[in-house]
Design a protein with these regions (language model features):
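NAD(P)-binding Rossmann-fold cofactor-contacting core
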Residues: 14-33
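Active-site catalytic pocket residues across diverse enzymes, especially alpha/beta-hydrolases
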Residues: 8-12, 75
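Short, cationic motifs built from Arg/Lys/His that form the positively charged side of catalytic pockets
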Residues: 67-69, 199-202
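Conserved acidic residues
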Residues: 20, 56-57, 101
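Glycine-rich adenosine-cofactor-binding loop
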Residues: 1-8
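Structural signal for interior beta-strand "rungs" in well-ordered beta-sheet cores
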Residues: 85-201
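Phosphate-bearing ligand-interacting subdomains
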Residues: 27-92
Length: 203
């Protein structure tokens, strides 16, 4: 029941789906309403979990990758299901795109032809993904970022708002790119970069 949950709920409702409720581990929120939808219980409440895959689908609205992974694994192991995608009706996605499970694609996102998007990625409002970009699992791309054609983004990379990544380079696993940066060279796995041009930040 956070900003991402509210945004996902809006997407599902605009697309004509019924949202039955939120699950949140903050017990102080239970039985309260958020945007006219009740917070029903915790994410480990079997009374609600047993409905997933039979009576309804689920989406994991969490931007913390560690928690997101834990919840994905729980759904897979306990319910043998994968979360659905939340794709805004105003997103423009090319016909020939590969899209995995559990992805959040917000309003104004543009995805070019030949793009491959893995599982459980977050593409925030207005970001542009050029042709033949490869995006691995659990990647986050901030609002207004431009990912040029042929870029490879490895698992768990984080790209802040308003970033520009030039064509053909690789963003390594777990790399972090600060907001507003212009990336003109490959970013190593686990590296944090910032600036124009983006440079590694020394710890």
């Amino acid at each position: 029941a956070n900003y991402l949950g509210r945004a996902a709920k809006e997407i599902f409702e605009v697309n004509g789906n019924v949202v039955y409720g939120f699950l949140d581990d903050n017990k102080s929120l239970h039985n309260k309403e958020l945007d006219e939808t009740f917070i029903l219980g915790s994410t480990d409440d079997d009374g609600f979990l047993k409905l997933i895959g039979k009576k309804c689908e689920a989406f994991i609205a969490v931007d913390d990758n560690r928690l997101r992974k834990n919840l994905v694994n729980m759904l897979h192991e306990v319910r043998h299901v994968q979360p659905v995608n939340a794709v805004h009706s105003n997103a423009l996605i090319a016909k020939h795109v590969e899209l995995g499970h559990g992805n959040f694609i917000d309003q104004g996102v543009k995805v070019g032809v030949g793009v491959k998007i893995g599982n459980h990625c977050l593409l925030q409002a207005g970001c542009i993904i050029g042709a033949e970009v490869s995006i691995s699992d659990f990647v986050q791309i901030g609002s207004g970022s431009i990912i040029s054609s042929g870029v490879t983004i490895e698992e768990e990379a984080f790209i802040g708002a308003g970033v520009t990544v030039v064509s053909g380079i690789t963003i390594g696993k777990g790399a972090r790119i600060g907001a507003g940066s212009v990336v003109v060279a490959p970013v190593k796995a686990g590296e944090t970069v910032f600036g124009n041009p983006a440079q590694p930040i020394k710890s």
